[in-house]
Amino acid sequence: MKNRKKTVLTGGLLVAVLGCVILGFFLTGYFVGGRSGNLARGKGVIATCDSVEQESLSADMAIDGDDTTLASRWSSENNWEDASHYIQLEFPEEISVSFVVLKWERRNVVSYALEGSLDGQKWEILQKFDTAPAERHQEIVLDEAVRARFLRLSIYAVSKEESDYSNLYQNVSLYEFEVYADKPAAYLLERPVIESSKEGGRRLAMPQAPAGYQVVFIGADLEQVIGADGTVYETIQEKEVTVGYRVEDVKGREEPREVSFTIQVPAGIQTAEQEEEEERRQNACPEGVIPAVAEWCGGEGIFRLGKAPRMIVDTDSFLRESVTEGKADAQILRDMADLFNRQCESCGILQEEMTIYEGTLEDVRAGDVYLGCAEKSGGLGEEGYTCDITDKCVIKAENVTGIRWGCVTLMQLLSDGEDNTVPQGRIRDYPLYTVRGFGIDVARKPVSIETLYDMLEVMSWYKMNDFSIHLNDNTILATSGLTDSPEQAMTADSAFRLESDMRNEEGEALTSQEYAYTREEFDRFIETARIYGVTVVPEIDTPAHSLSITRLYPEYALRTSNESVDQIDLEKEEAVILVEQLWQEALAEETGAFRQARIVNIGMDEYYGEGEQYRQFLTRINDLVQGTGKAVRLWGSLSHIDGTTWPSARNLQMNIWSTVWADPREMYEAGYSLINMQNNHLYIIPGGGYDRLDIRELYENWEPNKFYDYNQMEMIPSYSPQMLGASYMIWNDMSGSLDMGISEYDLYERFREPLAVLSGKLWGASVSKPGDMDDETGDETGDETGRSGILEVPEVPFGMNGCGLYADREAAVPDYEIQMKVYLNPEASVEAGQDGKYQEQVLAQGDGAYAKWAFYAVEPQTGRVGFTREGRTYTFDYTLPRGEWVNLTLVGTSGKVTLYVDNQETDTVGSDEPFKEHATFVFPLQRVGRQTTHFEGEMELDFRNGRED
C-alpha cells in the first residue's frame, strides 16, 4: 500500500448495489461521549456485583470515569471452581440504550452476555459472545435502541490458558462499564455500494454522510481491486475487500472515528453463457505456488515450453511513461530475464538454456514466454502482475517488480508440473501488504555476504520483498559480566560491519577488523536485490547499541551507569555531529554504501538518556536522511521515551517491536506508517529464549495487523495505507560470554522455517495446516478460489537448501553422512611440539569468509579428530592412529555432529537445544585429502544426504 490521496464527501447519492455486502465494522478512535454522554456516570446510578477480589475493587469503580488507574476497577473474586460472575447497573429511571463500551483490564472472558431488564427480574439477552474480546476496549452496538432500567454484564466462563496466566487468575476485571443512548455517527453510515457505468467501468460510490458529518475514504486492503479513487478494477474472480472511512463531526461533538465495511466484489461482468462455459472447461487453480495466487480463471489444456525455449522481452514497453526511469526499468527487465533463465537451469526446470530475445507481443509464438509492461488502468500497482497462459505464457506488470513475481510464479508452476507443462488459465496476482520482510543482525555475529545472497534468493522465491541488515551493535552489556566499571564495559564485543573511513585520533578504525562489507560489495548487493524484487534496508543503529562508536570515542559515551556506555551522550553536540558525518559518508552520492538504497533504518531503540534530547536527535537524523531523497525507517520508541518533539510522519516507517516502547494505536493515530515486528512473535534469538519462531502460533492466531500479548491486543486496520506489513528478525544476542556456537547455517535454517506461513499471510493467501501439526488444530483452511498455501517447509532449489550438495560453496549441509577411509602415514608428524601444539592434518577444507573452515584428522590444539568453522573449534574424543586404515563416519544434523569409528559410535559434539553449545557443521568439499594445505596420508570419501547421494 502506498500513500494515497483521501477522498472527502459531505453528502452523496446512493446507487443500486452490485454484489456489495456489509459484513462488519472495524473501528479506531474511541467514542468519548457523543451527544448523550455516558449514562452510567449519571446521578443515582447504582453498581452492584456478585463478588470482589478485595473491598477497594468494588463495582462502583467501574462507573467512576477512570479507565487507566489499576486501583480504579471492578475485579471479581478469584474462584477457580466457579468463574461465573456479573456486574449490574441500576438506573434511577428507564433509559434508552443503543451503545455500550466495556473497558477490560484483561481479555480473559470467553463466554459472556450483555443483558437488559425493566424490573430487575425478567432479563433479556441483548448480545451474547462466545469468544474473548478482540481488544480490551470493546464496543457493543445494538441493532435497535432498547428500553431498560437495569443492565447486567454476565460472565459464564473464563480462559484457563497458561500463556496469559488465566490458569492462575480466574477473576474478571473491568475498568469501565459505559452506557450511551446514541450510537456514534460512524455506526449510522450507509453501506458503500458499487455502481456500473454505461461504458462498462465500475466504481465504489461514497456512502452518504449523516447530517452534520463528513466522510473521508481511507482506502481498501486490496487496492488492486478497489483503487484509492474508488475505481473497481476488472478482476477475474470474485474478491472480498475491506474498505475504510473516517467519519468526522463538523461541529466537533464527537471524536473522528474510522469505520470499515467488507464488500464482495464480483469478477468482471460476464454473460451467463460465458460463466457456464468457463465453469465447464476450467482448469483447477494450481497448488504449487507459494504464496498462492490472488485470482485465477482456469482455461482448458496445457501450456508446454518449446523444445528450444524462448523468452521475448519487451523493453520498449517500459519506455512509455518516463525515458529515464524507463531505461533503468528496461535494463532491470533484461536482468530479470537472465535471472529467470539462470535459476531455471540451476534447479533443473529447463533441459536446455532459454534463448532471450528483445521483441513485442507480435513476436510471441506457441511455447514462448513474454515479459512486458501492462496498462496503468489495470490497477496492478507496484507489485501486481497478470499471467495469461494459453499456448504461450504472457506476463505483464506495471512495474518491473511485478515482472519478477510473475517469473517466480512461472518457475514454481514449471517445477510443479511435468515435462515443462503448466495448466492453461489466467492469473491476476498481487500482495495484500507492501512490506513482507525479514531482517538479520550481522553485527553481533558476522554473516558472510554469500549467506546474505542465499537468503535474498530464497526470500524472492517466496515473494518476500524487504531485507533489513542491522550493521552495528554490541554484546548486551547487562548480561556481559563486564560492568564493574565503564572501562571494563568498553571491552565488550562490538562491531561495525561496513567499510568506513572513520578513525579516532589514535588511528583506530570504526570498521570491524574481523569481517565487514566493503562499500562496493554492499552497494552491489542493494543493486542486485532489486533484480530479485527485494528492497534492502540497511541500518546504522544510534544512539543506543553504539559501543563500536563509543569505544573509539569514549568521551561521547553516556555515563549515567556502567551499562550505558554503549549509548551516545546526546547532550554533546560533537557526538551528534559525529553521527551525522557517519550518515553522510554512507549516503554519499558517488561513493556511499547506501547510495542506491530507497529506505534506510536509523535505529533509535532502547535509549535511556534524556527523552527530549533523543526526540530532537531523531528528528535531526531523520531530516538529514530524507534530505537525500530516501525514506526513513526506525525502531518505534516514542511511547516510552517522553518529550514534546514529534518527528514528521512523512516518509517515516516505524517498526513496532514492543507495544510498551511504541503503542501501535498511539503511533497509528499520530500518522506513522507501521510494520509489525512484535518481539514475542517475530523475533528469533538463535540458541536463546526465542530460538525459533512458533509456526503453530503464526498459523493459528497471528495476523500482520494484529499486535497482541498475554494481556493486550490491538488491531490496526489493513485497509489503511499506514499498515505496511510485517517482518521477522534474527538477533544474535547470544554473543560474547553467551556465545552458543551458532553458525551461519543455523541462522539460515531458522530464517527458512517460517517463510511459507508468513509469506502466505502477508501476500494475502489463505494457508493450509502445517504437515507436522496434529488434527487438533483443525482441518486445512483455504477458500474455493484456490488461494491456499502450503505450510510445510518445502524444498527451495536455491541457497543452502538442505538437499545435499551445496554447490555454490562446494559443501555438504545437514543432514548428511560422510564416510571416509583414512590412512595416516606412519611417518606423519602428529606429536605435540614444544609449544604444546600439534602439526595439523587436514582431511577437508574450504575457503571461509572470515575464519578457517576445515575437518581435521589431527586438530592442532588437541591432536584429536575435529573441525573448525566460523572461529570456533570442536574435537571428538578420538585420536587417529598412524599406519593403519580407519573407517570414519561423520553424521551431521542441526546443532550436532556424531563421529563413528569402524561403525562404532564414538562421540557426539553439540546440541540443538536452546542455551546449549551448538556444533552444526557444513562439511567442506572444496579441497579434500592431499588437495588440502597439509595431509600426510591417503583417504577415500563418500558423501550421502538424507535425500540424495
Each model region followed by its residue ranges:
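Acidic, contiguous N-terminal accessory segments
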Residues: 264-401, 409, 413-428, 633-641
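Aromatic, loop-rich ligand-recognition surfaces of beta-strand-rich domains
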Residues: 11-12, 29-33, 66-127, 131-184
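Feature activates predominantly on carbohydrate-active enzymes
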Residues: 378-565, 583-597
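Flexible glycan-contacting loops in extracellular carbohydrate-active proteins
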Residues: 908-941
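Extracellular glycan-recognition modules
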Residues: 795-866, 939, 943-949
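Short tryptophan-centered beta-strand motifs in secreted/extracellular beta-sheet-rich domains
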Residues: 467, 525, 529, 820, ...
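Short, aromatic/His-centered strand-loop micro-motif at the edge of beta-sheets
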Residues: 865-887
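Active-site neighborhood of glycoside hydrolase catalytic domains
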Residues: 559, 564-652, 657-664
